[in-house]
Design a protein with these regions (language model features):
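N-terminal, polar/charged subdomain of small-to-medium soluble alpha/beta proteins
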Residues: 1-85
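Hydrophobic C-terminal alpha-helix "anchor/cap" residues
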Residues: 42, 46-47, 107-108, 155
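A generic structural signal for short beta-strands and their flanking turns/coil linkers
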Residues: 54, 72-74, 111-117, 134-138, ...
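Residue-level signal for inorganic ion chemistry
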Residues: 42, 92, 118, 208
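Short, surface-exposed acidic-centric catalytic microdomains
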Residues: 4-17, 102-103, 107-147
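Flexible, gly/pro- and Lys/Arg-enriched active-site loops
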Residues: 2-3, 8-9, 127-134, 146-152, ...
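Short loop/turn motifs enriched for small/polar and acidic residues
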Residues: 59-63, 121-123, 180-182
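Extended accessory regions or peripheral subdomains of proteins
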Residues: 84-104
């Protein structure tokens, strides 16, 4: 940790002895076939166990592995870190406030994830298909060890458990969860675009997002959330 290096304060550092003991106990108490699995599980547990640990590079070596070659060791080396994601939430069916509260709790309960901040919920008119009830919308900020596709899969599962049915595009829904930002990633795939491709056009996303991240910059257009909201409001 940089602060420990600048202040020489032990309390600002990660306790190396505790980390070493944790690794030793993990290796003793777990059995896996692949080094890759050992590395992934150990790093994930370390990041969740030790507060202030943001990124880990880990190498696991296996001496004299049976690979049919005169090698002293084979190894797996990985780097994993916490990521920051912003999620938009919406509902216009059932008890929407309870549904959104439950969704926040479900996201916070995900393994390898922590909800850090939640906006208030706002009531907004429907977008696209207008012949339907008003929506309740909000946004949250979370830390996660999931990669984008993994996070999307978990959000889709939470939607489904809340009764989400994908029948009418932009139609009524019990729960809608969208990844708006994921770090400063720019990615466009058939099933997932980050940042969300329509976010700059949607006041129901920008208004609650501005409450928790006014100065977060869009990695594509360079504008802050507040700037995008002001431009949309003025248009």
């Amino acid at each position: 940790k940089r602060k420990a290096g600048k202040t020489d304060e032990l309390t600002e550092s990660i306790h190396y002895g505790e980390v070493s003991a944790f690794i030793t106990e993990f290796i003793k108490s777990h059995t896996y076939k692949l080094l890759e699995r050992v590395a992934e599980e150990l790093v994930e547990d370390m990041l969740q166990k030790f507060d202030g640990l943001e990124k880990v590079t880990l190498e696991i070596q296996k001496p004299w592995a049976p690979v049919g070659l005169p090698l002293k060791t084979v190894s797996v080396r990985i780097t994993r870190s916490w990521h920051t994601a912003y999620i938009a939430l919406g509902s216009n069916m059932g008890d929407s406030r309870q549904i959104l509260d439950d969704a926040v709790s479900a996201i916070d309960a995900l393994p390898a994830s922590k909800v850090e901040k939640v906006s208030g919920f706002i009531t907004t008119p429907p977008y696209g298909v207008t012949d339907q009830p008003d929506f309740l919308n909000g946004c949250l900020r979370m830390k996660t060890l999931y990669y984008p596709k993994e996070l999307l899969r978990e959000l889709n599962r939470i939607e489904k458990e809340a009764g989400r049915e994908r029948i009418i595009h932009w139609g009524p829904r019990t729960l809608d969860l969208d990844i708006i930002f994921y770090d400063d990633l720019i990615s466009q795939e058939d099933d997932l675009c980050i940042p969300h491709v329509e976010m700059h056009k949607r006041s129901f996303v920008l208004e609650p997002l501005e409450k928790i991240a006014p100065y977060k910059r869009h990695p594509g257009n360079g504008k802050t959330v507040r700037q995008m909201l002001e431009e949309l409001t003025d248009s």
